[in-house]
């Protein structure tokens, strides 16, 4: 254990995903030897994330504005919504060039062991976008105070692109059950070929492109 600010910095880095105690220590010691201007740039970048990044009020993607660039793009297909767990998953799908619709970010997946249920995810916002109603009573008290102005009865398909692991599959099954209450709505899931137990961000572009084009109706 070190003392004072150095140990405090190591402890903070250790809290980051994928950063263990040894990695945190290496990063902290690296920062001891960089130029003051580099420290200032790091401080500015951290402050910009806190003050300059928000969440799109339509799809819950990260954005610098009230509405993200994808939702604001009139050329995107409004009839299709691709549901993902995290904003990083959008970047993976966009790189395939296969999908031209819009997205909805859940903010995670159902995980009872971590006390993450439907109310902790952006599910009620998704249902409002599709038809402005909440078919599942357990979500009723999680409705945003400000209704989304993008409630779109023209949505014809929802693609469930949650991760192909236990939590992602459970989330997809839950959403598929909810979305059956919407008449004439097609609910689909990425086709087989996705590596089971993995995360969407680690799937190569060709595999993901094929999974999108060959998606299965639930």
UniProtKB/Swiss-Prot annotation:
MF-aspect GO terms: DNA binding; zinc ion binding
Domain spans labelled Toprim: 79-195
Record-level GO BP terms: DNA recombination; DNA repair
UniProt keyword Zinc present: yes
The keyword Zinc belongs to this UniProt entry's keyword annotation: yes
Keywords noted in UniProt: DNA damage, DNA recombination, DNA repair, Metal-binding, Zinc, Zinc-finger
Highest rank taxon of the organism: Bacteria
C4-type zinc-finger residues: 56-71
Gene3D superfamilies with a match to the protein in the record: 3.40.1360.10, 6.10.250.240, RecR Domain 1
InterPro entries reported in the protein's UniProt record: DNA_Rcmb_RecR, Rcmb_RecR, Rcmb_RecR_Znf, TOPRIM_dom, TOPRIM_RecR
Pfam families associated with the record: RecR_C (PF21175), RecR_HhH (PF21176), RecR_ZnF (PF02132), Toprim_4 (PF13662)
Stored SUPFAM superfamilies: Recombination protein RecR
Functional note: May play a role in DNA repair. It seems to be involved in an RecBC-independent recombinational process of DNA repair. It may act with RecF and RecO.
Family recorded in the similarity comment: Belongs to the RecR family.
Protein name (Swiss-Prot/TrEMBL): Recombination protein RecR
Source species: Corynebacterium diphtheriae (strain ATCC 700971 / NCTC 13129 / Biotype gravis)
Lineage: Bacteria, Bacillati, Actinomycetota, Actinomycetes, Mycobacteriales
